[in-house]
Amino acid sequence: MKEELMKLIIESGCIKFGHFILTSGKESNYYIDIKSLITNPKALKLIAKMIKEESRKLGIEYDKVAGPELGAVPIATALSLETNKPLLIIRKKRKEHGTGKLIEGEISPGDRVLLVEDVTTTGGSVIRAAKILKEHEAEVVGIFVVVDREEGAKENIEKEGFKLYPLVLVSDLFEAAGVSKD
């Protein structure tokens, strides 16, 4: 399944070369534009199936699925549908109207939450989301990411007491594409 996912990433034109500023603030000569992939039903089904199977193999038990907006929302939604587990959406900032929530969906103390993300570089966005879940007394039982850029996310996430499970490492992706990230 990993090879199939890498093929879809490559065929979807997700790897872009040029000069980019990433969410982390880092500059990069390549960008993984996963949005074209996560708007593809076939890819979303595959990603959800992979996360479901990997989490089962690892013995990770969870009650709810969560993802930070925007990129992780389609992934979390697909996984919620695949597993029949309720969905949580972590907002980038508190709503300034209505309820002012940071989390959309029902969350209760003690909920075991599987967090998903599209791409990680330093892990800042997903760490923030995990901390918001912890503030609501939920337990983050694991973090799955579609592509890890291998630029410190795993180490930073583990320093915060969470575990990262990448479906694809960027080094494997570039090798499969037959290109260099330099």
UniProtKB/Swiss-Prot annotation:
Positions of 5-phospho-alpha-D-ribose 1-diphosphate binding: R91, K92, K95, H97, E117, D118, V119, T120, T121, T122, G123, G124, S125
UniProt cofactor(s): Mg(2+)
Catalytic activity: orotidine 5'-phosphate + diphosphate = orotate + 5-phospho-alpha-D-ribose 1-diphosphate
Keyword Membrane: no
Domain of life: Archaea
GO biological process terms held by the UniProt record: 'de novo' UMP biosynthetic process; pyrimidine nucleobase biosynthetic process
Gene3D superfamilies for this protein: 3.40.50.2020
Annotated pathway: Pyrimidine metabolism; UMP biosynthesis via de novo pathway; UMP from orotate: step 1/2
UniProt keyword terms in alphabetical order: Glycosyltransferase, Magnesium, Pyrimidine biosynthesis, Transferase
SUPFAM superfamilies found in the cross-reference section: PRTase-like
Enzyme class: transferase
HAMAP family (UniProt xref): PyrE
PANTHER family found in the cross-reference section: OROTATE PHOSPHORIBOSYLTRANSFERASE (PTHR19278), URIDINE 5'-MONOPHOSPHATE SYNTHASE (PTHR19278:SF9)
Physiological role: Catalyzes the transfer of a ribosyl phosphate group from 5-phosphoribose 1-diphosphate to orotate, leading to the formation of orotidine monophosphate (OMP).
Quaternary organization: Homodimer.
Descriptive protein name: Orotate phosphoribosyltransferase
Organism: Pyrococcus abyssi
